[in-house]
C-alpha cells in the first residue's frame, strides 16, 4: 500500500508500453530541445472513445482552466471549483501506524478510516509483533476510533502481506488459512470496536490466483459468522480487472468482499519522468482502469485509490518526459509543497510536476495536487464508483484544498456502523 511498495503486477504490466508512451511524450522535446513549447497530445487523444467521453465530462465537472501545452504553469483549485456538486460518495482515508497520535484527521470529511496495519502469518494467523500490531494492542488507536465513530465513520483494520512465501502458503491451504485469519482478527475487531477488515495482500504469482480466491471466500464467510455486520474491503492493482495472469481474479473475488480499493498509483515508468497516477495516457491510467473494472463488476463497489505522494526523478534534461538518470525517490505532497517550487502541467496525464536543478543535475517531481485529485474524483463519480480514497492521510499536510478536491462539493456518504451488504456466493 505504501509508496515504497510498488504493486508488482502493475509494475510488470507497465513495461514496454509505458516506455513507448514516455518516448512519445518526450519525442518533441528531444527533437526541438531548445524550445520546450511543442503541443503535447491531449489526454483524450490517447484513449478509446468511451474513455475519452468520461475524461471530457470529468474535466467539465471541475471549473479549472487546464493548460493544453506541456510545461505551462499548473492551475490551482479555486473555491467553487465544482459549480454542480459531484454525486455524494465515500471518502476512504488510510491512517498508518506511524501517524497514530501525531495526526488528527478531518473525520467529518471521511466515510471510512483504515488503520494500516497488522501482518499476515503463513498459516493465516496474525503476527503478534511489529509496530503496527504493537500500536493497535497498546490502545493508542482508541482516540482515533472514538472520534471517527462520533463523526459517523467506519474504522477498518488492515491485514497486510507482500511476502511471496506467506501468500503462497495461505493460497495453498486456503480454507484453513482463511478461517484462521477470521478467527484471529475477530478478537482484535471486538476489542477495538472496529467495523471490519481491509485486506492488503500484495501478491504477484499467477499460481496463487485460484487459491487466493478460496482464501478470501473462507475468510469472509467465517468473519460474517463470527461477527455479523463486519465489512471486508480488498485492495487490488490497477491492472487486476484485465490481467488474466495477475494475482487478483477480480470477477471471482468480488463475490466475497464488500468493496475493492483500487490502488491506482505507482503506475509510473521508473526509467522516464512520469506520473504515478495518470488520469489518462496510452497505457495504465485511471480512465482505462475504471472502465475495465466497471466491465466486470458493479462500479458502485469500487473505491478509486489516489496517492498523496509523488516521485522525484533525476533526469537528463528539463523537458516533459525526460529519461531518468537514476531511480525515482518517493516524496509526499506536503514535502513537495514545502519545497516551494512552482509546478507546471502535463496535459497528457492531467497531473502537475516540478522541474529544478540540484547539485548541477536536473530533477523532475511528478505528483498529484488538488486539481488532479479533483479530476480523479470527478472521473470516479462519472463511472458511478462508490467513492475515492487516499494513501495516506498524513501526506496531505492538512491542506484543505485536498479535502475539497476529494469531496467534490458534496458531503461524504456516511455508512451505518457494522452494516454491510449480504454476502453473494455464500
Language model segments and positions:
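N-terminal secretory signal peptides that target proteins for export/translocation
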Residues: 1-10
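Bacterial signal peptide processing site
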Residues: 27-32
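Conserved, mostly hydrophobic/aromatic
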Residues: 113, 199, 260, 304, ...
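Substrate-binding surface in catalytic domains of secreted glycosidases
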Residues: 123-139, 204-339
Amino acid at each position: 500500500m505504501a509508496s515504497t511498495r510498488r504493486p508488482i503486477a502493475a509494475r510488470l504490466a507497465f513495461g514496454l508500453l509505458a516506455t513507448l508512451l514516455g518516448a512519445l511524450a518526450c519525442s518533441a522535446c528531444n527533437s526541438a530541445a531548445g524550445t520546450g513549447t511543442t503541443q503535447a497530445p491531449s489526454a483524450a487523444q490517447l484513449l478509446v472513445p468511451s474513455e475519452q467521453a468520461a475524461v471530457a465530462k470529468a474535466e467539465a465537472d471541475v471549473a479549472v482552466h487546464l493548460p493544453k501545452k506541456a510545461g505551462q504553469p499548473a492551475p490551482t483549485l479555486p473555491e467553487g471549483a465544482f459549480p454542480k456538486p459531484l454525486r455524494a460518495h465515500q471518502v476512504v482515508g488510510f491512517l498508518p501506524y506511524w501517524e497514530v497520535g501525531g495526526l488528527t484527521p478531518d473525520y467529518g470529511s471521511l466515510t471510512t478510516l483504515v488503520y494500516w496495519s497488522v501482518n499476515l502469518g503463513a498459516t493465516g494467523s496474525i503476527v503478534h509483533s511489529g509496530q503496527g500490531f504493537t500500536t493497535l494492542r497498546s490502545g493508542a488507536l482508541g482516540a482515533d476510533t472514538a472520534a471517527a465513530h462520533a463523526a459517523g465513520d467506519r474504522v477498518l483494520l488492515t491485514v497486510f502481506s507482500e511476502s511471496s512465501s506467506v501468500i503462497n502458503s495461505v493460497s495453498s491451504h486456503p480454507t484453513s488459512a482463511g478461517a484462521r485469519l477470521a478467527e484471529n482478527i475477530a478478537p482484535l475487531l471486538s476489542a477495538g470496536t472496529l467495523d471490519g477488515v481491509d485486506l492488503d495482500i500484495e501478491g504477484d504469482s499467477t499460481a496463487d490466483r485460484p487459491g487466493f480466491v478460496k482464501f478470501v471466500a473462507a475468510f469472509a464467510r467465517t468473519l460474517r459468522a463470527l461477527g455479523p455486520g463486519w465489512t471486508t474491503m480488498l485492495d487490488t492493482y490497477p491492472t487486476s480487472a484485465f490481467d488474466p495472469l495477475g494475482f487478483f481474479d477480480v470477477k471471482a473475488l468480488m463475490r466475497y468482499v464488500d468493496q475493492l480499493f483500487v490502488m491506482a498509483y505507482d503506475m509510473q515508468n521508473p526509467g522516464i519522468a512520469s506520473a504515478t497516477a495518470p488520469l489518462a495516457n496510452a497505457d495504465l491510467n485511471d480512465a482505462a482502469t475504471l472502465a475495465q473494472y466497471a466491465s466486470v463488476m458493479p462500479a458502485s463497489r469500487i473505491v478509486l485509490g489516489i496517492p498523496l505522494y509523488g516521485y522525484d526523478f533525476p533526469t537528463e534534461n528539463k523537458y516533459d518526459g525526460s529519461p531518468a538518470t537514476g531511480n525515482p525517490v518517493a516524496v509526499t505532497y506536503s514535502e513537495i509543497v514545502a519545497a516551494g517550487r512552482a509546478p507546471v502541467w502535463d496535459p497528457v496525464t492531467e497531473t502537475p510536476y516540478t522541474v529544478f536543478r540540484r547539485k548541477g543535475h536536473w530533477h523532475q517531481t511528478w505528483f498529484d495536487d488538488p486539481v488532479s485529485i479533483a479530476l480523479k474524483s470527478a472521473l470516479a463519480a462519472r463511472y458511478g464508483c462508490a467513492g475515492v480514497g487516499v494513501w495516506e492521510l498524513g501526506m496531505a499536510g492538512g491542506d484543505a484544498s485536498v479535502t475539497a478536491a476529494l469531496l467534490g462539493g458534496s458531503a461524504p456518504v456516511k455508512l451505518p456502523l457494522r452494516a454491510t451488504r449480504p454476502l453473494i456466493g455464500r
